[in-house]
């Protein structure tokens, strides 16, 4: 996944792999941003969650299939993209932002836009932190058949990232 993201114009800063000892659930996380955004205000966090029960159930189905049969498309892993920006002195209107980003993400990449206003001290002005989340389901059947369209998702994520990088300077100014 990390190498694939690099092929689509992203620069990787960090990667992590977690295994929960009780359930054996695993999460692969990658921190990245567009190549032109190095040193910029935008962070993108990618997380792939692997449930071993889903993987084992998929394996059971595949083992019992005839050689020429395709497995059912019932087994998926969540892939989550989370964009974050630093506190924004002149934060955007959230509804306008959600509408604008819907045009960038299109139907292929539905985006959730949220913000948190916090007060560092009672006498300080509020700080608005912006978060955008996209959730995708990665089909194990399509991966097995070599058809998983992750390229389209990464291209949409790059477009969203570039749009946010272009818009961020106006939100960061006082």
Predicted feature residues:
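N-terminal interaction modules that seed assembly of large macromolecular complexes
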Residues: 6-65
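Generic structural hydrophobic/aromatic packing signal, biased to beta-strands
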Residues: 10-12, 30, 46-48, 79-83, ...
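Short, charge-rich amphipathic segments
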Residues: 24-35, 80-95, 162, 166
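A general secondary-structure signal for short beta-strands and their flanking turns/coil
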Residues: 25-27, 39-43, 74-78, 125-133
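Catalytic micro-motifs at enzyme active sites that drive phosphoryl/nucleotidyl and oxygen chemistry
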Residues: 33-35, 65-70, 117-124
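C-terminal basic regulatory modules in eukaryotic proteins
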Residues: 41-108
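Glycine-rich, aromatic-bearing surface loops/beta-hairpins
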Residues: 89-174
């Amino acid at each position: 996944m990390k190498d694939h993201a690099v092929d689509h114009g992203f620069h990787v800063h960090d990667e992590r792999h977690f295994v929960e000892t009780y359930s054996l659930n695993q999460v692969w996380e990658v921190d990245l941003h567009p190549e032109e955004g190095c040193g910029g205000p935008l962070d993108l966090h990618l997380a792939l969650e692997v449930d071993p029960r889903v993987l084992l159930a998929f394996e059971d189905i595949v083992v019992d299939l005839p050689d020429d049969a395709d497995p059912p498309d019932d087994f998926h892993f969540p892939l989550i993209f989370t964009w974050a920006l630093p506190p924004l002195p002149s934060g955007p209107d959230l509804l306008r932002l959600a509408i604008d980003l819907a045009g960038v993400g299109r139907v292929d990449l539905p985006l959730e836009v949220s913000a948190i206003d916090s007060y560092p001290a009672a006498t300080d002005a509020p700080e608005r932190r912006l978060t955008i989340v996209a959730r995708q389901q990665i089909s194990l059947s399509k991966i097995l058949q070599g058809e998983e369209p992750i390229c389209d998702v990464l291209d949409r994520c790059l477009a969203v990232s570039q749009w946010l990088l272009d818009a961020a300077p106006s939100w960061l100014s006082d």
